[in-house]
Structure formats: structure tokens, C-alpha cells
Swiss-Prot record:
The keyword Secreted applies. It holds the Pfam family Glyco_hydro_17. Component of a multiprotein complex of 250 kDa composed of at least HYR1, MP65, and PRA1. Glycosylated protein with a polysaccharide moiety composed exclusively of mannose and glucose at a ratio of 12.7 to 1. Contributes highly to the carbohydrate component of the matrix. Treatment with tunicamycin impairs glycosylation. The active site is at E316. This is Cell surface mannoprotein MP65. It comes from Candida albicans (strain SC5314 / ATCC MYA-2876) (Yeast). InterPro entries: Beta-glucan_modifiers, Glyco_hydro_17, Glycoside_hydrolase_SF. GO terms for molecular function: glucan endo-1,3-beta-D-glucosidase activity. Residues 72-93 have a biased composition (Polar residues). PROSITE patterns: GLYCOSYL_HYDROL_F17 (PS00587). GO terms for cellular component: cell surface; extracellular region; extracellular vesicle; fungal-type cell wall; hyphal cell wall; yeast-form cell wall. The keyword Secreted applies.
Length: 378
């Protein structure tokens, strides 16, 4: 597992994690709120990576845990997590060698098994940031507007895109710095092969496969109740085959929420590393300044659910600047800044922030906050 900071957590030994609620962000052709729950128990785990180790209290998924997915239009009921019981994180050096989280663990997906591409953290303070090519009215931003906005994101090593429409891949390839890479996405799983053909054409005309950090097939499909784990397997296999034919040999993943992976550990077998979305705001029991500890805990929970075989990258995490409160989670610009600072400090090297700019084309969404997650928007 890749961490920017190595952290010790203490959790009450007899604590029992209550069910979690998670909602996902709207993207094109997606308008549903989802409630997924699981039951976990707390165990203490020590993992290592090279010459550093991490000790944490990681919830382990109970053997009898079952999936509960319901699609509805109401915000899910919120329940506290064990994050409230987690002590303040502190970084520390260590010379102890360990291998429990080594990316050399075998997996069935590909030669990239378990591994996330190497790379550090730029001046942006996190691995990357998500970007949307849609204007306020839902149309496509111009190439010049995309270039101007991407220039503001030069401090991030990775720019995450969700699809191939609006010529977004071409525009971002032209606008990004030579050292930046794109986390590309095939959003429409009904046309995976054609989506990859569009991606390949964009890469051929404006860059090379070296510019692509990872390719994701689908986003939060299990969490949304739109696909089963076995369907995700088929989607990823189709995507991997088409990508290989197009000359791409890098990592292929399917992004879902942390709770969907915990509830469906079969998902661990299909992606080359675990790419999961996790937002403390939707928990409702985490204040903004504790977001980093909460996100790090979800990284640890996913890592545990996957048997320590796969590195974990958070592919969405952030905080809204406007909207209605969700328990103790209060949207505001100052709270957004506090949350982002906390995430960068605790796990920035393992996190892609959500999102660069406000998405005013979206519906108001849960807590009337869906439009207002833009970190660089006023």
C-alpha cells in the first residue's frame, strides 16, 4: 500500500463498527442515490512497505457479512463509524522491514497485479484531482477553457477523467504538462470497446500510452446496483482485451465505493489495484478536519478486505463548499479547505481529490451539495 505518511491509529479494543452509509456523485447519465451497509469487527494489523511500516486498527469483514444494496431517491440513514474512536494521527519514521502490503502478491487480473503505478505527490499535495469537461448548462467546455483550467492543476501528477466524450482526452492531453498523467475512464459500459477505440485515437493523435496512468472501466456500478461483481469481471476483461489490442499495457481497474468493495471482496480479483471512492461528508459523523483520518481508515479497510494483496488508491475524496449539513458534516468553503488539508496530510499520496471545479450542470442532489465540490471554485 502506498502512503505519504505512516500512521499509528488506536481504536477501542472492544469497538464494534456500526453500518456505514455511502452515496455517490452524479456523473453523466447517473442520477441515483444509493445506500449500502456492512457489519465489521475491529482487529489490529501491522503492514510494511519497504523500510517503513504502518500499524493500524483495521476493521475486518465478518464472514457472514452480506451485501445490502437498495436504490432509492432519499438520502440514506447515517450511522457513526469507528472513526470517532480513532486517536489523532502522528507520523513517525521506522526502520522495521515488513512485507504484508507488498505489491508483489499474486493476482489473477494481469501482470500489473496488486500494483499501482509509481509516482510521488506534486505541489498540489495529493496524488491527483478529478476534472469534468462539462459547462454549467451541461454542454462541452471549449478546448481553450479546458486548457485554462488544466493549467491551474499543474501541481497534481494525475488528472482523473470519467469518459471520452466532449473530446476531453484530447483536450487534456494537449493542456497537461509533460510530467502529468491521465487516469482515463470508460464510463459507458454498454460500449466499452468503442469507448476504448475513442481513447486510443485520442492518445495516438495527442500523446502516447505513457501519458495514461490507469484506465477505469465503469464507476461505482456495484454501489449503484447497476452491476454485479461477476458483471464487473466481464467488463474489465472486455476492457483489458481491447486495451491490449490498442497497445496499452498499464493498469486496468473498475472504480467503486469503498463499502461496495468491502461488501463484495470478489471485486478485489478483477482490478490491477483497488480504486475506490470515499467521502467523509456522507458519513455524517465526521467533522471536516477529521476527514484525512477517516479516509485513511477506509484505505485500510479495503486493503484488509482484499487480504492485503492489492494496493489501494482513493479515486474520489473531498468536501462540499455549499449545501445542507449532514449531521456534524457542514458544507462551507472553510470546512472544505480543512477537509482537503487533512486528507493531504494523512493520505495525500494515496488520494485523488474530488473535484477541480464546481459542477453546476448537476442536479442539487443529496443535501443540496452535489454541485459544489469544486476545490478551485469560489
Amino acid at each position: 500500500m502506498l502512503f505519504k505518511s505512516f500512521v499509528t491509529f488506536t481504536v477501542l479494543a472492544n469497538a464494534l463498527a456500526a453500518p456505514l452509509a455511502h452515496q455517490h456523485h452524479q456523473h453523466k447519465e447517473e442520477k441515483r442515490a444509493v445506500h449500502v451497509v456492512t457489519t465489521t469487527n475491529v482487529v489490529v494489523v501491522t503492514i510494511g512497505n519497504g523500510d517503513q511500516t504502518t500499524t493500524f486498527a483495521a476493521p475486518s469483514v465478518a464472514a457472514e457479512s452480506s451485501v445490502s444494496v437498495s436504490v432509492n431517491t432519499e438520502p440514506p440513514q447515517n450511522h457513526p463509524t469507528t472513526t470517532q474512536d480513532v486517536a489523532s494521527a502522528s507520523t513517525y519514521p521506522s526502520s522495521t522491514d515488513g512485507s504484508a502490503a507488498s505489491s508483489s502478491a499474486a493476482a489473477s487480473s494481469s501482470s500489473q497485479a496488486g500494483s499501482e503505478p509509481s509516482g510521488g505527490v506534486g505541489s498540489g499535495g495529493a496524488k491527483g484531482i478529478t476534472y469534468s469537461p462539462y459547462s454549467d448548462n451541461g454542454g462541452c467546455k471549449s478546448e481553450s477553457q479546458i486548457a485554462s483550467e488544466i493549467a491551474q492543476l499543474s501541481g497534481f501528477d494525475v488528472i482523473r477523467l470519467y469518459g471520452v466524450d466532449c473530446s476531453q482526452v484530447e483536450a487534456v492531453l494537449k493542456a497537461k504538462t509533460s510530467s502529468q498523467k491521465i487516469f482515463a475512464g470508460i464510463f459507458d459500459v454498454s460500449s466499452i470497446t468503442s469507448g476504448i477505440e475513442s481513447l486510443a485515437e485520442a492518445v495516438k493523435s495527442c500523446g502516447s500510452w505513457d501519458d495514461i496512468y490507469t484506465v477505469s472501466i465503469g464507476n461505482e456500478l456495484v454501489n449503484a446496483g447497476s452491476a454485479t461483481p461477476s458483471q464487473i469481471k466481464a467488463y474489465v476483461e472486455e476492457g483489458r482485451k481491447a486495451l491490449k489490442a490498442a497497445g496499452y499495457t498499464g493498469p486496468v481497474v473498475s472504480v467503486d465505493t469503498f463499502i461496495a468493495v468491502i461488501n463484495n471482496p470478489d471485486l478485489c480479483d478483477y482490478s490491477d489495484y483497488m480504486a475506490v471512492n470515499a467521502h467523509a461528508f456522507f458519513d455524517g459523523h465526521v467533522v471536516a478536519e477529521n476527514s484525512g483520518a477517516w479516509v485513511l481508515q477506509q484505505i485500510q479497510r479495503v486493503w484488509t478486505a482484499c487480504g492485503g494483496k492489492k494496493n489501494v488508491l482513493i479515486t474520489e475524496t473531498g468536501w462540499p463548499s455549499r449545501g445542507d449539513s449532514n449531521g456534524v458534516a457542514v458544507p462551507s468553503k472553510s470546512n472544505q479547505q480543512a477537509a482537503i488539508s487533512s486528507i493531504k496530510s494523512s493520505c495525500g499520496a494515496s488520494a485523488i481529490l474530488f473535484t477541480a471545479f464546481n459542477d453546476l450542470w448537476k442536479a442539487d442532489g443529496p443535501y443540496n451539495a452535489e454541485k459544489y465540490w469544486g476545490i478551485y471554485s469560489n
